[in-house]
A protein has these predicted regions:
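Transmembrane alpha-helices
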Residues: 1-89, 101-107, 130-131
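Hydrophobic alpha-helical transmembrane segments of multi-pass inner membrane proteins, especially
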Residues: 62-293, 333, 337-391, 418, ...
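Long extracytoplasmic/lumenal interhelical loops at the membrane interface
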Residues: 305-342, 362-365, 369
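A juxtamembrane structural motif centered on a specific transmembrane helix
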Residues: 52, 388-445
Length: 445
């Protein structure tokens, strides 16, 4: 059995490397036949890697529940690949497959860490993907969504204030809201969507100095509310997203310089005012000096990454559960320990591939609202990955940010899937409009 488990980890690494290669090949090659061939390979690698991960776990657990969960996930993946392409033939096949690959990796590692959390994650993901099927049509058909910028902003702030007043505190931040005493949600994840819609809609109407000041006040109120919740990681994501959307909309480097300077000053003030920020900075500077207390989490994370080496320990062969909150904030450490450093690097490359794709979609758009919307989501997505991975590997202090589409957390999964579907709607709409224009020109000829 040990030989089989050892072989599965190398097979998963090869599959991950091959998938990553084809993901970038699709990005570079513009020939449709080459892209279609790579898509077929990527689909095969996706399902084979998913099977290999569950096969390795089944060899050690021997549980029928594992087979049922695996079968449910395969069914969902097949339905998504089938129905999304039928309903929206113009969507990005690359973005769709990358999303499913990230979800599959998340399912595997969460099943290894906590079967109950993996089941919960699966059902939430299935519902989110079902809801997401309607999002692209809504985005590219209803142009009036750009007319309610102030409503998006006010609704987002109101939701954050509600959490501040009656929310539940976890890990030092008041970011969770209990619904009917049945389950909790993290409204910040959904406010991210409202925030980007708000900024894109308002700057679509104009970028004069008066409007810039008004929108900045709106964005500042959102960030300050997150600061009062002590969700400084979330506040940082919102702040950086706004600064880059502001710069893109106005094309004035002065705004970018002032924003980044102000952000640096705000970070210094946060360090002076909040004790938990000081603790995280201390743990970042010298984790082994505080290994029994403040530095325990990051120390265990570094031990896990170092233990995994380049090729990993194999599923159920490491000790990732010694890391506090490993299923959410520090899940990248668990992946690096059991799948290996090379696998973890390929994972980062897939995230980078998604980020580049979102940026390219934004650059090709002529409609200012959709351009800002795509860019805002790209920055928000990319910066969240930077904060999550950077905190885990001790590149920056930990900010308590989850890894999109992989970490445990229903709110994060739902919001990220909706975000991807919004982008797909923009992409599909652009392809549909271009095709309609070609058909009209042919008809005229």
């Amino acid at each position: 059995m040990s030989v089989a488990i050892e072989l599965t980890k190398y097979l998963m690494l090869l599959l991950m490397g091959a998938y990553t290669y084809h993901a970038f090949r699709v990005s570079v090659k513009k020939n449709k036949s080459i892209q279609d061939k790579s898509y077929r390979w990527m689909t095969g690698f996706l399902f084979t890697l998913h099977f290999t991960g569950y096969f390795a776990m089944y060899l050690q657990v021997q549980s029928d529940k594992l087979l049922l969960l695996y079968g449910g996930e395969v069914l969902v993946f097949v339905l998504v690949l089938t129905f999304y392409r039928i309903v929206y033939p113009g969507i990005s096949g690359l973005l769709l497959r990358n999303m499913l690959m990230l979800l599959s990796i998340g399912f595997i590692i969460l099943t290894r860490l906590s079967f109950d959390k993996a089941v919960r994650q699966f059902f939430i993901t299935a519902v989110a993907l079902g809801i997401g099927l309607a999002v692209p049509a809504f985005i590219y058909r209803f142009k009036w969504i750009r007319n309610y910028g102030w409503i998006y902003g006010i609704a987002g702030i109101a939701l954050l204030v509600l959490v501040l007043l009656v929310g539940t505190e976890r890990y030092g931040a008041t970011s969770w809201l209990t619904v009917f005493k049945l389950f909790t949600i993290q409204p910040t994840e959904f406010v991210k969507l409202l925030f980007v819609f708000c900024i894109a809609a308002l700057f679509d109407e104009g970028t004069d100095f008066k409007r810039v000041c008004a929108v900045t006040v709106m964005a500042g109120a959102t960030v300050l509310t997150l600061v009062f919740q002590k969700d400084l990681g979330g506040a940082l994501i919102f702040f950086v997203t706004y600064i880059f959307m502001l710069y893109t909309a106005t094309e004035k480097p002065l705004y970018l310089f002032l924003g980044l300077s102000g952000g640096s000053m705000a970070a210094w003030v946060a360090y002076k005012l909040f004790d938990h920020v000081k603790v995280r900075v201390m743990a970042w500077q010298n984790p082994f000096g505080y290994i029994d207390n403040e530095g325990y989490q990051i120390s265990q994370s570094l031990f896990a990454i170092g233990t995994g080496g380049w090729f990993g320990m194999g599923l159920f062969q490491g000790l990732p559960t010694t890391i506090p909150v490993v299923d959410s904030d520090f899940i990248y450490s668990a992946i690096a320990e059991e799948f290996g450093g090379l696998f973890a690097l390929c994972l980062i490359l897939i995230y980078i591939n998604c980020f580049i794709l979102l940026i390219n979609i934004s650059l090709k758009l002529e409609d200012n609202f959709y351009r800002l919307l795509s860019l805002g989501f790209a920055v928000m997505f990319g910066f969240q990955i930077f904060l999550s991975v950077g905190g885990v590997i001790k590149f920056i202090p930990s900010t308590g940010v989850t890894l999109p589409l992989i970490s445990s957390g229903g709110s994060s999964i739902v919001a990220t899937i909706i975000m991807f579907m919004v982008i797909q709607g923009i992409y599909h709409g652009g392809n549909t409009w271009m095709q309609s224009g070609r058909n009209e020109r042919k008809h005229e000829e």
